[in-house]
Curated annotation (Swiss-Prot):
Residues 809-819 have a biased composition (Basic and acidic residues). Residues 30-666 are extracellular. It comes from Mus musculus (Mouse). GO terms for cellular component: plasma membrane. The lineage of its organism: Eukaryota, Metazoa, Chordata, Craniata, Vertebrata. It is a single-pass membrane protein. This is CUB domain-containing protein 1. Residues 417-540 form the CUB domain.
């Protein structure tokens, strides 16, 4: 208890002492005296436009004021009415230096008055130097040098340098700088304005720069940036992010050790509307035979440069009506030359027409420490952090990078076939070319965009090795995988991510699709040669996709609906063709008990159909409980058809299939064998009885005379009349009904209506067609159909070839109509002879 009281007393005493110190600091008197003809003016003003609740005043001669100005030759004493004046007031010390009427005070610039003579406020020292247009002024900065910052950025220690120049009467901002950078000198012409901002807690008492006299530089300014080792610098054009002055020239000089290499990359730029001349950047590169080298701002900038070089930005004469703005922000990266920079790689895209290859940095976050950049160089000179190689050319590239794992390659290729008559049954292989695998940079994505004629053909993907669908229950752990997406206009349907080592034999997609090979580990280069997708064009089908699955006897096969976590698109249908070996039994299990789907219009169904017996079960996904685990002895279909769901009610289904060996009951086998033996014994008895009865009933043969039989020898007949006088050249038509009419009569004597088949497009052998869902707006309950009672939607088909017979007609057969109407359900039309 005593210890706690003691601690509280110490804390209270510290707070009182701190408050007393702040109170004394605010109430103690300050005195500022400025020498005559010093050119220095001191002003104390309120810093924030919105005054706080408790107003703080400057107290001078018992007067409370909010602004105080001290001019050369004046001495003033004052105090503050509050204990924290640094939160209310700012101090500005401005010195005007006239180099036009007299000599300039060149050399080190001092802080006048010194910081020890000033009250503890946020301070800004301003030096405004005016000179003739023909005189150049140079600001030299001591170590540590300056680092330019962009708009919205701040310095860690709060100390900033703002530098401006003059073009006639117009002030031009050169930039804002912090400490610890590479900028060592800034050369100006026609005067310079330098502002040093010091926070109230900073005890700095030197300016940190000096002014020197130079000859005319014939441009707006020259900024010198010195690199003593590896590092980077970000620099901006004058007035950035505003517009660069019209038709002006600005130069940056870079000092780089000879053993290091420098690369330039433009981070942000805009060009204006030029009437005359052209906006450009010019490089003076040591050893170049074409100095200066001229580039447009849109061009790839030089890289891998050894030693010092200059970069200049040249403006143009802008359009008076619509000038636009010219601005530039760029980065210079200096680093050690890498071994890869001496190697050249050939990328031959001369035979390609629809392929592009991009080398770019991986999205990795770096800390504050310097990280050497990674550049891709074309022809060893034009370097950039990312390069896109287009089709139709041979490209020579090299790398300026200390760690090539920080880069990766993305490739896109379009494969299209627009003539469905030519495309049908055509196939090709999706495989990564060898020249891409030989690059020292790892492949990230290789995307094939597959285009087919609309509503004419569909696509089928057949892998070299069966695929596994990536799920949370069984994730893919391979070095690469495939992402399959249907790219139908207006609807992108993501089928999922697949890897080798599964049970999916083929994937059929209705329309245009995108297949992306994504590499996850460098070892994929050794494994990808074993894999490959064969793409072929197949007859068009209406479902979004069809998966052909042959389950593994050792593992579960997990399958989930497309667009997982986003829901199957409205009014779309997907099927799975699941094969079951003859000696196995498949168990189908759905993960959820209910789908949680709510339809706005239409109905959603899940159909399970046996392919051999055509028996099927139909489940309403909106109203009913999803099917419980079911066993299937033969191959079967699983179909999911979606409705138009309500917002937030999406359709996602996950199910799996397992195989177990088929077992046979011994009692059933014995019973079947016994039944077969009894049946065979009964057949033998029946045959013996029939033969014995025939022998008893058999009598002697009896001859029968038939007087209607012609017993004369056949002779050649002659026509009693001429051809013109008889109808021997007219033939009667014998209908099938007159020959086979007795076969068309039922037990009642009436003729049976002929069976007329309808044309159906060929869809392969039995089992290749997924089940057809009920109409979208029907209210069909769950129905089960057996082999003896087929579903109405599946009419029986005869295995033999169907014949169609016309009905018999009581009228006479016309002699002029000899065609038999094979597909007509009515009798032949009567005609007059």
């Amino acid at each position: 208890m005593a210890h706690s009281a003691c601690g509280f007393s110490v804390a209270l005493l510290g707070a009182l002492l701190l408050g007393t110190a702040r109170l004394l600091r605010g109430t103690e008197a300050s005195e500022i005296a400025l020498p005559q003809r010093s050119g220095v003016t001191v002003s104390i003003k309120l810093g924030n436009p919105a005054l706080p609740v408790k107003i703080c005043y400057i107290v001078m001669s018992r007067q409370h004021i909010t602004e105080l100005i001290i001019r050369p030759g004046e001495r003033k004493s004052f105090t503050f009415s509050c204990s924290n004046p640094e939160k209310h007031f700012v101090l500005k010390i401005e010195k005007n230096i006239d180099c036009m009427s007299g000599p300039c005070p060149f050399g080190e610039v001092h802080l006048q008055p010194s910081t020890s003579e000033l009250p503890i406020l946020n301070r800004t020292f301003i030096w405004d130097v005016r000179a003739h247009k023909s005189i150049g002024l140079e600001l030299q900065f001591a170590t540590p040098r300056l680092r330019q910052i962009g708009p919205g950025e701040s310095c860690a220690d709060g100390v900033t340098h703002s530098i401006s120049g003059h073009i006639d009467a117009t002030e031009v901002r050169i930039g804002t700088f912090c400490s610890n950078g590479t900028v060592s000198r800034i050369k100006m012409q026609e005067g310079v304005k330098m502002a040093l901002h010091l926070p109230w807690f900073h005890r700095r008492n030197v300016s940190g720069f000096s002014i020197a006299n130079r000859s005319s530089i014939k441009r707006l300014c020259i900024i010198e940036s010195v690199f003593e080792g590896e590092g980077s610098a970000t620099l901006m054009s004058a007035n950035y992010p505003g517009g660069f002055p019209e038709d002006e020239l600005m130069t940056w000089q870079f000092v780089v050790p000879a053993h290091l290499r420098a690369s330039v990359s433009f981070l942000n730029f805009n060009v204006s509307n030029c009437e005359r001349k052209e906006e450009r950047v010019e490089y003076y590169i040591p050893g170049s035979t074409t100095n200066p080298e001229v580039f447009r701002l849109e061009d790839k900038q030089p890289g891998n440069m050894a030693g010092n070089f200059n970069l200049s930005l040249q403006g143009c004469d802008q359009d008076a009506q619509s000038p636009g703005i010219l601005r530039l922000q760029f980065q210079v990266l200096v680093q050690r030359p890498q071994d890869e920079s001496n190697k050249t790689y050939m990328v031959d895209l001369s035979r390609e027409r629809t392929m592009s290859l991009t080398i770019e940095p991986r999205p990795v976050k770096h800390g504050r420490r310097f990280v050497p950049g990674c550049f891709v160089c074309l022809e060893s000179r034009t370097c950039s952090t990312n390069v896109t190689l287009t089709a139709g050319s041979i490209h020579k590239i090299s790398f300026l990078c200390d760690d090539l794992t920080r880069l990766w390659v993305n490739v896109e290729k379009t494969l299209s076939c627009l003539d469905h008559r030519y495309c049908y049954r055509q196939s090709f292989k999706l495989q990564v070319p060898d020249y891409i695998l030989q690059l020292p940079v790892q492949l990230h994505d290789f995307s094939w965009k597959l285009l087919v004629p609309k509503d004419k053909l569909s696509l089928m993907l057949v892998p070299g090795q069966k695929l596994q669908q990536h799920t949370q229950e069984r994730p893919c752990n391979t070095s690469f995988g495939y992402h399959v997406t249907s790219t139908t206009p207006g609807q992108d349907l993501y089928f999922g991510s697949f890897c080798s080592g599964g049970s999916i034999e083929k994937i059929q997609v209705k329309q245009n699709s995108s297949v992306t090979l994504r590499a996850y580990a460098p070892s994929f280069q050794q494994e990808v040669s074993k894999q490959g997708l064969i793409v072929s064009y197949t007859p068009y089908f209406k479902e979004e996709g069809i998966f052909t699955v042959t389950p593994d006897t050792k593992n579960k096969v997990y399958l989930r609906s497309p667009n997982w976590d986003r829901g199957l698109p409205a009014l779309s249908s997907v099927s799975w063709n699941i094969s079951v070996p003859s000696n196995q039994v498949a168990c189908l299990t759905v993960l959820k008990e209910r789908s949680g789907l709510a339809c706005q219009s239409g109905r959603a169904f899940m159909i399970i159909q046996e392919q051999q017996s055509r028996a099927e079960e139909i489940f309403s996904l909106e109203e009913e409980v999803l099917p419980k685990p079911s066993f299937h002895h033969h191959s079967f279909w699983v179909n999911i058809s979606n409705c138009s769901p309500m917002n937030g009610k999406q359709l996602d289904l996950l199910f799996w299939v397992t195989l177990t060996p088929r077992t046979v009951d011994l009692a059933v086998v014995i019973g079947a064998a016994g039944g077969g033996a009894l049946l065979l014994f009964a057949l033998v008895l029946i045959i013996c009885f029939v033969k014995k009865k025939k022998k008893v009933d058999k009598g002697p043969a009896v001859g029968i005379y038939n007087g209607n039989v012609n017993t004369q020898m056949p002779q050649t007949q002659k026509f009693p009349k001429g051809r013109k006088d008889n109808d021997s050249h007219v033939y009667a038509v014998i209908e099938d009904t007159m020959v086979y009419g007795h076969l068309l009569q039922d037990s009642g004597g009436s003729f049976i209506q002929p069976e007329v088949d309808t044309y159906r497009p060929f869809q392969g052998p039995m089992g290749d067609c997924p089940p057809t869902p009920p109409p979208l707006f029907s209210r069909t309950p769950t129905a089960k159909f057996t082999a003896e009672e087929l579903a109405p939607s599946s009419p029986p088909e005869s295995e033999s070839e169907p014949y169609t017979f016309s009905h018999p007609n009581k009228g006479e057969i016309g002699v002029r109509e000899t065609d038999i109407p094979l597909l007509h359900t009515q009798g032949p039309v009567e005609t007059e002879e």
